[in-house]
Regions:
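N- or domain-start disorder-to-order transition segments that initiate the globular core
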Residues: 17-45
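N-terminal, post-signal-peptide region of Sec/Tat-exported proteins
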Residues: 40-76
Length: 216
């Protein structure tokens, strides 16, 4: 049996106290847990979602400390939103020492905070030969959808269509409402685009990452 950690919502509440400390609370019981206690609880699950503020150093520190505690008897797979499907072969090659780090970074389009926040996870995976999933849709494809709407596939190159998920749905529900409200609160320049297209592009990302995890 394997289990997958997805670096994205965690089932516990994390109260950030400062840049150096945090408190972990089981939202079901209100009980404060140690990191080891949380890891022991999480080991019961096949799929663990870790939601993060991508720029929060404390949460990244927590990720780095948590992953080794989960890497025990069961096969562990790590899935990252940052890496996109078209760089999976490059990610695999780096984990297997077929690419240098410079070659890998040149090919894989990592986020600007990769070195400080994500590199330790990838290096741990490389050391332990843990599978890492490049789960997301290539950003160029999601961007095209955000700019032109759901008919964007008509202008996609055939070589790009292979990165699409088999199914894409756009639920008209509370998720959509919350997504659009968040964009409005952020006063994001993206709102200059059609808000529905932005939502659909997010759904495309969600569907792609979900399918990547299921197929792992």
């Amino acid at each position: 049996m394997k289990y997958i950690i997805v670096i994205l919502i965690i089932i516990m509440n994390l109260t950030i106290l400062s840049a150096e400390e945090y408190r972990i609370v089981d939202s079901r019981t209100g009980k404060t847990l140690s990191l080891q206690q949380m890891a022991n609880e999480l080991k019961k699950y096949d799929l663990i979602f870790f939601g993060e503020d991508h720029d929060n150093a404390t949460l990244h520190k927590l990720e780095r400390e948590l992953v080794p505690l989960l890497d025990t008897k069961r096969e562990l797979i790590l899935s990252l939103e940052m890496f996109e499907r078209d760089v999976q072969s490059d990610l695999d090659a780096y984990i297997e020492n077929w690419l240098t780090e410079d070659e890998f970074l040149a090919k894989s389009r990592p986020w600007s905070n990769y070195q400080d926040d994500y590199r330790p996870l990838i290096e741990y995976a490389k050391q332990k030969k843990i599978t890492v999933i490049a789960a997301n849709i290539p950003r160029s494809i999601a961007g095209k959808m955000a700019r032109t709407g759901p008919d964007f596939t008509e202008t996609l190159l055939e070589e790009d269509k292979k990165w699409l998920p088999d199914n894409i749905s756009y639920p008209d529900d509370s998720y959509k409402k919350a997504f659009l409200e968040t964009l409005e609160d952020m006063h994001s320049p993206m709102m200059n685009n059609n808000p529905d297209w932005l939502y659909q592009a997010q759904c495309l990302k969600d569907e792609t990452m979900a399918e990547s995890i299921v197929n792992a």
